[in-house]
Amino acid sequence: MDLHRQTEPETEHEAILSVRGVSVSFGAQTVLDGLDLDVRRGEILGFVGASGAGKSVLLRTVLGLNRKQAGTIRMFGKDIEAITPDERLAVDMKMGVLFQHGALFSALTVRENILIPMREYLDLPQRLMDELALLKLDLVGLSAAAADKFPSQLSGGMIKRAALARALALDPEIVFLDEPTSGLDPIGAADFDELIAKLRDTLGLTVYMVTHDLDSLFSVCDRIAVLGGKKVLAVGPISAMLAHDDPWIRSYFRGKRARQIAMPEQMPNAEMYS
């Protein structure tokens, strides 16, 4: 099922996240060097690159978990290093994060995991928070019966969905997904892709998705950003990636596996790449 949706020209879109000239080093090793990237409101942006290129480093830097040595990061139009604590709190409440392996607390039930951000940021009665937790579970396709289960009692796909429910706990405007289909079987991964597309369309979410999953890139991403050489090499829809002349991008998006996934209309003149 092709869930891909083209975005409009860039001039018509607000950048919900804007990264300019960001450099990150660990000791003598520079991982990111003068990186620029915009994430547009309402889009699903896939972020790809070779293993070790720095995809997770950028994600953690945007989230404030890594320190940068240069550059600016603006969320919702605000420089995250030049805002007051109250403004930072407001920004944090507009973001949700799904880490690669779910990162659910093993000693807490699914419901208790979902309640963590609510308890941290909101002042609501317990009964209302419990009801909201069940609503979030329903939103990601899990039944109320999952609420009182522990992570060890869940399948891999259920863990991902429960973690996504937690990421949606505060009704964020943007969600950051780190390898959301990693470890899922092809059917489970396709179902998760469909869920992400549905949530974007129904909730108006912006989605920043770090992924190696070619199926996700071809089916749900409006645009794709490619990281290489410590910078963003290219940003654009899948059609732009297929037409790009960078050797790594050509290999990634025109390789044998990509040709098996791509629809014929997405891979023009496919015989050229055989």
Predicted regions, residues:
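The feature captures the beta-strand-to-loop junction immediately N-terminal to the Walker
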Residues: V48-A50
